[in-house]
Design a protein with these regions (language model features):
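Phosphate-binding P-loop
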Residues: 2-6
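Walker A (P-loop) ATP-phosphate-binding motif of ABC ATPase nucleotide-binding domains
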Residues: 9
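Hydrophobic anchor at the beta1->P-loop junction of P-loop NTPases
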Residues: 12
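The conserved Walker
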Residues: 15-16
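Conserved substrate/cofactor phosphate-moiety recognition/catalytic segment
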Residues: 24-83
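Conserved phosphate-donor/acceptor-positioning beta-strand/loop module used by diverse small-molecule
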Residues: 102-121
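Small-molecule kinase domains that catalyze NTP-dependent phosphoryl transfer to phosphate-bearing small molecules
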Residues: 127-193
Length: 193
C-alpha cells in the first residue's frame, strides 16, 4: 500500500467492546498522560512525532472516501483493528500488505477478560438494541446466553487466531495491555434543563 511507505504504524487490536477506541484516544492525546508515556517508552515511539488514527476498515475505502487519506499524511499512524469484525480475511490480508510497505509496525493487543467484555456487550446492546454489531462478537455474546463455557472458549480462540496472525508478520515491537491497566474516567452524564 503506497500510502504507508515510510510510515510508523501502531496496530491497536482487540475484540468489539474491549476498549480499543478509549485506548487509542489515550495513546494519541497531546495532554500529559503517564499511561501513554509508558507505552511509548516500551514500544520506542517518539512522543513528538505527529500522529493520527484510522480504522483498518477505512483503509479499504480510501478511493470512495478521500477524507480518510488526509489521516495518512502523519508519520505515526495508529490503526484500529477489531479482531471480531466482519471480513476478517480481507482485513488480515490488508494488514500483511501494509506491514511489507511501512517503515515500522508495532502491535498493541488489548486483553479484556471475558466477564468484563460480556458486561460491556450487554450494556452496548441495552443502550441501542437495534444496532447490534453483526459480527463474531455478537455471535459469541448470543452463544453466552446458552453456554457461558463455550462462549468463553470461542472468545479466547479469537485472541489465539490474532496471535497466530501477528507471528507471521515481522514486527518491530509488540505489547499486550490488560484492560485493568487503562485508567478509565467515567463519562459525565448529560443533563437536560
Amino acid at each position: 500500500m503506497k500510502e504507508m511507505i515510510g510510515k510508523d504504524l501502531v496496530i491497536v487490536a482487540g475484540p468489539s467492546a474491549s476498549g480499543k477506541s478509549h485506548l487509542i484516544r489515550q495513546l494519541t492525546t497531546k495532554r500529559k498522560n503517564k499511561f501513554r508515556d509508558k507505552v511509548y517508552r516500551q514500544l520506542g515511539i517518539n512522543p513528538q512525532e505527529p500522529r493520527s488514527h484510522i480504522s483498518i476498515g477505512a483503509l479499504t475505502k480510501l478511493d470512495s472516501k478521500p477524507g480518510h487519506s488526509r489521516k495518512l499524511i502523519k508519520e505515526l499512524i495508529f490503526i484500529h483493528f477489531d479482531i471480531t469484525s466482519r471480513h476478517q480475511s480481507d482485513k488480515q490480508h490488508l494488514l500483511k500488505s501494509i506491514a511489507n510497505s511501512c517503515r515500522s509496525i508495532k502491535v498493541v493487543t488489548l486483553k479484556t477478560p471475558f466477564d468484563v467484555w460480556h458486561l460491556r456487550m450487554r450494556q452496548r446492546i441495552d443502550v441501542n438494541p437495534t444496532k447490534n454489531p453483526s459480527n463474531i462478537a455478537d455471535e459469541i455474546y448470543r452463544l453466552s446466553r446458552f453456554s457461558r463455557y463455550f462462549a468463553r472458549w470461542r472468545y479466547e480462540s479469537i485472541y489465539k487466531k490474532w496471535e497466530k496472525l501477528i507471528k507471521n508478520i515481522d514486527l518491530d515491537g509488540q505489547l499486550i495491555v490488560k484492560n485493568e491497566e487503562i485508567s478509565v474516567k467515567p463519562r459525565k452524564k448529560k443533563t437536560i434543563d
